[in-house]
């Protein structure tokens, strides 16, 4: 074997080895993507069934091991059974929801209601069976039922006031509640003044009367009727009606609850604080600390200065004591409304969003906050589901267009085949005419017969050529039309692909950006760190990693409030970003911690840059009500060495940061 053959086989062997390594890396990457996808899918599937949750937990544990085959072979059959059982239970729950909604609708239909109200109730009852099969329709059904029930209550309330007929409560729950409600009771001021502790349910009764609306939303408080007080006092231990706030009453089941005095409507001119002073008692101890632990005071705006000659950009908001719910309710309502307005909901969810907006706007109380958040979470999940469906619809349309594209290509190929067939037919016709002409010449006996034969053959040739040209023109016109339609379809697909790519890029940038500071977040840091490490392994050069942490940031939050802390983070992020080079990278790692990547920078140059950053932060003229406030930061910096992984270098820089913290803060440590 010659030297060239040896070298050729050697190169071929090395090339195959390199190809095998590339395939192995690609396979490992696919396995890793599959693992990550399964882990995230298992997390997304949790919460619906305990058995499925347990299988999902075991699946994640198996995926963390290198040997997955044995674990998966034992887990998959159990997972399939758990999923089937969960689906059966889901169907049972769906049927229970349908039965419950149907029973509520029939109870309302049993009342003496006007025709304009009975018609939508009947339509609602007919639609329950079909709509309740879809879980996303349940909140909409409940909202519609709540609206219809509110209209029925208002109608019955007006009718009872006019003719004295039995009330809705008496007709729904029987005579015992009516007898209980008819007993005399003390007025609300005496009830409130009697005790500052939660009202505990007293003697048991067969059922709890559902309180009607005695006041319009947003109207002044009215005296609590004696029947209302008697109904509350006689409620069974497992039932408590939620105090009315201008929305349909809700009944909480399955566990004893307490009614706080501040959740009941009081007479005009009587405040809850005055009643507590009359009773000589303290605030109820069981009320959450963030509700009643401090006097209600309006929050001072972040940029509201007191006229001092200071830089407004660095003015910190005053400390806000832990407010009562009524003080923070406007802020919560505004935040929820902004979040609701920012959701791009499909038209099918717009009625639900409008109903939720009405519940939030001006009538939200502490007891309704949790169900409102639950409904808002349902909307957000539906938006995510809608985005998934939009993506599926886009893929479906893309598939249809690709099928059409392939159809056009098939038609073009068929047209090309027809052209070849026409050309072969024309060639055959010419050959036949020429052969006939030759035979006629050979067989001719005189000049006249030869002339007639030649004319006949020439006419045949001309006819064949005319037919061929006609077919060719028709085919060219058809092909031109197909090509034009194909070009238009391709242009449309390109535009759709560009728009979708732009949308994906926008979503990706949002996912990689910290919403508070506008800096890249932790996910963006991981991506950039991987790129910089790969570049360094490929091209060489220096690469530094630094970790910065704001000193005593928790004290800033505790002393001046979280709004002040947020403003400090935004200002410091801006100061750091504008002092870095374009090739440098900074990200908010979490809390008050920032990470900086410095490519192509020596350790000494990086140390000097970090010192300048520290000095710039210390020089920021933060102030609070005109008083200067000094804020500093500590940092740790280190350089990549050899083929170190990013996690190892980050851990070393983090340890240097904590050495700076232990050494007194406001300093830089080099590792």
From Swiss-Prot:
It is found in: Cell inner membrane. The keyword Membrane applies. It catalyses: 2 GTP = 3',3'-c-di-GMP + 2 diphosphate. It comes from the Bacteria. Its EC number is 2.7.7.65. Mg(2+) binds at residues 549, 592. Residues 204-226, 277-297 are annotated as: Disordered. Binds 1 Mg(2+) ion per monomer. It holds the Pfam family GGDEF. SUPFAM superfamilies: Nucleotide cyclase (SSF55073). Its cofactor is Mg(2+). GO terms for molecular function: diguanylate cyclase activity; GTP binding; metal ion binding. One of its GO terms (cellular component) is plasma membrane. GO terms for biological process: cell adhesion involved in single-species biofilm formation; negative regulation of bacterial-type flagellum-dependent cell motility. Substrate binds at residues 557, 562, 566. Keywords: Cell inner membrane, Cell membrane, GTP-binding, Magnesium, Membrane, Metal-binding, Nucleotide-binding, Transferase. The record marks 554 as: Transition state stabilizer. The active site is at 592. NCBIfam families: GGDEF. Catalyzes the synthesis of cyclic-di-GMP (c-di-GMP) via the condensation of 2 GTP molecules. Cyclic-di-GMP is a second messenger which controls cell surface-associated traits in bacteria. Localizes at the cell poles through interaction with FimV where it increases the local pools of c-di-GMP. This is Diguanylate cyclase DgcP. It comes from Pseudomonas aeruginosa (strain UCBPP-PA14). The lineage of its organism: Bacteria, Pseudomonadati, Pseudomonadota, Gammaproteobacteria, Pseudomonadales.
